[in-house]
């Protein structure tokens, strides 16, 4: 109530100035929303998303494919066990590679721990470069380099993940509380001791959360890796698609969905453990 009376007690010109500021702010926000909406609408029109005729004409084909995929054929489930294990192993190994390399790169890619601005700039460029190349393209390159199998998938997932995981790790380091860091430096700690005892304990929960999230993502991405010859359940999926065994395709997709659900549930348990 007191704040209401204080506002009313202001001079008329000052009250009018405040209200005019509120009005200008509202119109500015409305204009920004309108610009964003216009850009989104233009993008949807450009890619044909607003072409209702094309979308409606495609519905019968989608219905036909869905009909041919029913009921799912699980008769070949025994041959999917090894590819599923390969997919899970690829996601775990790729995430492990990403975490190890990101721990090294992140400390030199964070402004408050980088030893020199030049080192910081090089590290950031490296992370941006790794992040800009899709893991699918990396998978194709590594398949050509080392052959078919799970290894090219692991290398592709690991290197691409370094770009994203390293970025998140570096941002977590940049937002640490500086008080413990300054206290450690004042006590005569070496730079390595500062990192181990003042910085790392603060960012460990964030690091764990990012690593778990990336593992979830890598499991999904590892199914796509198989489509370019990098092994895993995606390879089996592409084989069924090539020979138009849509019932088997539906079964494999359901198996992938079940595995993704299990991975998500397990990652949720891990997150609670690290909090």
UniProtKB/Swiss-Prot annotation:
It is found in: Cell inner membrane. One of its GO terms (molecular function) is ABC-type phosphonate transporter activity. Residues 84-267 form the ABC transmembrane type-1 domain. The chain crosses the membrane at residues 30-50, 88-108, 136-156, 221-241, 249-269. It comes from the Bacteria. SUPFAM superfamilies: MetI-like. Keywords: Cell inner membrane, Cell membrane, Membrane, Transmembrane, Transmembrane helix, Transport. The keyword Ribosomal protein does not apply. It is a multi-pass membrane protein. It holds the Pfam family BPD_transp_1. Probably forms part of a binding-protein-dependent phosphite transporter. Probably responsible for the translocation of the substrate across the membrane. Belongs to the binding-protein-dependent transport system permease family. This is Phosphite transport system permease protein PtxC. The lineage of its organism: Bacteria, Pseudomonadati, Pseudomonadota, Gammaproteobacteria, Pseudomonadales. The gene is ptxC.
């Amino acid at each position: 109530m007191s704040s209401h009376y204080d506002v009313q007690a202001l001079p008329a010109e000052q009250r009018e100035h405040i209200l005019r500021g509120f009005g200008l702010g509202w119109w500015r926000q409305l204009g920004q929303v309108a610009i964003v909406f216009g850009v989104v609408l233009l993008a949807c029109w450009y890619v044909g998303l607003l072409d209702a005729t094309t979308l409606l004409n495609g519905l019968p084909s989608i219905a036909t494919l869905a009909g041919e995929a029913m009921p799912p054929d699980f008769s070949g489930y025994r041959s999917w066990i090894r590819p599923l294990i390969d997919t899970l192993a690829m996601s775990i190994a790729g995430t492990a590679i990403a975490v190890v390399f990101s721990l090294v790169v992140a400390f030199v890619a964070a402004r408050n721990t980088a030893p020199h601005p030049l080192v910081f700039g090089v590290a950031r460029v490296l992370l941006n470069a790794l992040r800009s190349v899709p893991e699918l393209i990396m998978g194709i390159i590594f398949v050509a380099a080392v052959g078919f199998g799970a290894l090219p998938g692991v290398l592709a997932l690991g290197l691409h993940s370094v770009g994203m995981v390293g970025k998140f790790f570096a941002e977590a380091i940049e937002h640490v509380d500086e008080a413990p860091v300054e206290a450690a430096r004042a006590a005569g700690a070496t730079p390595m001791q500062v990192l181990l005892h003042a910085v790392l304990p603060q960012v460990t929960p964030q690091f764990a959360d990012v690593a778990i999230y990336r593992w979830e993502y890598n499991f999904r991405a590892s199914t796509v890796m198989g489509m370019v010859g990098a092994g895993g359940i995606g390879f089996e999926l592409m084989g069924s698609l090539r020979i138009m065994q849509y019932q088997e395709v539906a079964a494999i997709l359901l198996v992938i969905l079940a595995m993704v659900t299990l991975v998500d549930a397990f990652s949720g348990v891990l997150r609670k453990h690290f909090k």
